[in-house]
A protein has these predicted regions:
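Short, solvent-exposed linear motifs at loop/edge-of-secondary-structure regions
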Residues: 1, 6, 26, 529-530
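Cell-envelope and extracellular/periplasmic
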Residues: 43-579
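Sec/Tat signal peptide C-region and signal peptidase I cleavage site
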Residues: 38-42
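N-terminal secretory signal peptides that target proteins for export/translocation
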Residues: 1-21
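Bacterial N-terminal signal peptides
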Residues: 25-34
Length: 579
């Protein structure tokens, strides 16, 4: 059978079109075999995915999966750290071995793969913990563009901290490899010369783990700015999600139009024609004194639809080449682009699907998954708090995914933004908080002074109780230790009566003897309160934290439907999502 991973991009596009049932799939495969098959088979040699290379880190304490390709049915021997494993490639040239589990090892060792006369050799390979750091631009954001980079980079000499950046891209079909070019697709030890290209969040996360655990840390940065959750979920899974059908249908329609229009030439003609038609309408409107009509053609809408940010595209191009790799866990920072327009609508289905899909791809149904809750951001048009902004939906979906999915963690980041930008420059606190979660929940690190697990959560809302004209808020045990308001400031609290109109509220921490602390919330404008919200806006303000200065999670005590902008749909909490 023809291996799709060996096909050139044009062939993959053809396969995508046929797979969408525009023509019979069997005919497509026969055509592709005729066009590309003989050449691909003739060129089959010993090779491995680019995730394997010089200076890489392999996952400790578990059998290590190694795979690649060789001549059909040729013998293959993999040797590393004093052990060798033999196998033979199958008829399609694919092979796979499992090395025995190894402890952490900070001294670089040679890694070799042999098949008859062919040899692949990788040098300076370490054994430690490997983390996949995915998402969109805030995870892609390089250390050199982060706050205090001028202080951090000169001291970033950590030979045991390694990272690899996977070039952003999309594909209509799953890929077996990613490109290695222009400094991307290759492992690098962290040093003042290289650290600036590491993801800022991933760097601070990995650096803290490396220093605390004293083992090598490998960071795989597979992030792409502007992506949505549906871009990181497989096509097969998306087809089972009702809210994703609009996106799939729109993509398939664009594929049909592209092919029917004659690919690039036809697309250019359609764009020119659409421009002429719109210009004619605009001239008529101006003569009448009206505004320009909507729908001005955008050349991007006439590009190859199988390129770029398409449903499942980044997953196919950036994650599928890693499928089956041994990982310690995942750190995922995504959601900003699902807070634009009506992109929040499928998020409740697609975001949890990222977790389940990635766990399936990496063959670990309990793979630790750290979720970074999106930061606050705003625009010049909306600098005040906005209860119905899409970001509130996104953060609540992220919170509910954490609460309903085992072995996940949620890291707060809304307070890391000091400039209202969608790209906060302060990556250090976000990386540190993520490291707290990993150390506590994944590695079981204890706080010796407290004789308790290392604290990683801020206060988590648990319940409310009305006391006359005030509401008392209780928090989950363990998250409320040292509960306090920064400088006794009540920023971020809002309270409403039965009219569902929220007002800025006053708040204070109260603590009866032998009872856990609570927050008392009130407003003279709301004599009969029924609901409280905290840090509930597009650019949240908040002052509530625990003794470790970990911020409280945004919360609301009500379940009232939200009406996010730009759409008529309501957002309501699904049964069982109350947290």
């Amino acid at each position: 059978m023809l291996d799709p991973g060996l096909l050139p991009p044009d062939a993959l596009f053809i396969m995508q079109v046929f797979d969408s049932r525009f023509l019979p799939a069997t005919f497509a495969l026969c055509l592709l075999q005729f066009l590309f098959g003989p050449r691909a088979e003739a060129e089959q040699k010993l090779r491995m995915p680019n995730i394997f290379g010089d200076q890489m880190v392999l996952q400790r304490d578990n059998p290590i999966r190694i795979w690649g390709w060789a001549g059909a049915e040729c013998p293959v021997v993999v040797s590393f750290a004093g052990q060798s494993q033999s196998t033979a490639a199958d008829r399609d040239g694919k092979w796979e071995v499992l090395l025995q589990a190894l402890p952490a090892h900070s001294s670089g060792q040679a890694f070799t793969v042999k098949s008859r006369e062919e040899v692949l050799s990788f040098k300076d390979v370490l054994v430690g913990d490997v983390w996949l750091c995915g998402g969109q631009s805030n995870m892609e954001w390089r250390l050199r563009g982060s706050r205090d980079a001028d202080l951090e980079i000169p001291s970033s000499n950590y030979p045991g901290l390694r990272f690899i950046r996977i070039r952003p891209g999309g594909s209509p079909a799953p890929q077996d490899n990613f490109p290695k070019e222009k400094g991307e697709g290759a492992w690098l030890p962290c040093s003042p010369e290289t650290a600036g290209d590491c993801s800022g969040v991933a760097y601070f996360f990995g650096q803290r783990l490396h220093r605390h655990l004293n083992v090598p840390i490998g960071l795989i940065n597979a992030a792409w700015g502007g992506t949505m959750a549906q871009h990181w979920v497989s096509r097969e899974t998306l087809e089972t999600l009702p809210a994703a059908q609009t996106y799939l249908g729109d993509y398939d329609r664009k594929c049909r139009e592209w092919v029917d229009g004659g690919r690039e030439e036809g697309a250019s003609k359609r764009f020119t024609l659409a421009q002429e038609q719109w210009q004619a309408l605009a001239e008529d409107a101006r003569k009448r004194g009206d505004k320009d009509p909507p729908g001005k053609p955008n050349r991007r809408d006439y590009q190859n639809p199988a390129e770029g940010r398409i449903p499942a595209g980044p997953l196919n191009a950036m994650i599928m080449p890693l499928a089956g790799l041994n990982l310690r866990g995942v750190l995922f920072y995504q959601g900003e682009n699902n807070s634009f327009g009506d992109a929040w609508i499928p998020f409740r289905e697609t975001f949890p699907a990222v977790v389940s899909d990635w766990r399936r791809l990496f063959r670990n149904n309990d793979l630790p998954f750290g979720i970074i809750q999106i930061a606050g951001w705003s625009t010049r048009r909306s600098m005040t708090y906005d209860m119905n902004h899409h970001t509130n939906v996104v953060r609540e979906v992220q919170f509910n995914t954490w609460r309903s999915t085992s072995n996940t963690g949620l890291i707060v980041s809304f307070d890391a933004n000091s400039n209202s930008s969608i790209h906060p420059g302060r990556k250090h606190p976000v990386g540190d908080r993520a490291a707290r979660w990993a150390l506590s929940e994944v590695h079981g690190v204890m706080d010796d002074a407290r004789r308790k697990p290392l604290q990683w959560r801020g206060p988590v809302y648990e319940s409310m109780k009305k006391e006359k004209d005030r509401i008392h808020i209780a928090f989950e045990e363990g998250s409320d230790e040292g509960l306090r308001l920064e400088r006794a400031d009540a920023r971020g609290f809002y309270i409403a009566g039965r009219d569902k109109i929220f007002h800025h509220a006053e708040a204070r921490v109260i603590a009866a003897r032998d009872a856990p602390p609570q927050v008392e919330v009130w407003s003279d404008d709301v004599p009969d309160p029924v609901a409280v919200r905290y840090a509930w806006s597009n650019l949240p303000l908040g002052s509530l934290m625990n003794g470790k200065e970990l911020p409280a999670y945004p919360f609301r005590t009500d379940t009232w439907p939200l009406k996010p902008h730009y759409g008529e749909a309501l957002y309501e909490i699904a049964p069982g999502d109350e947290g």
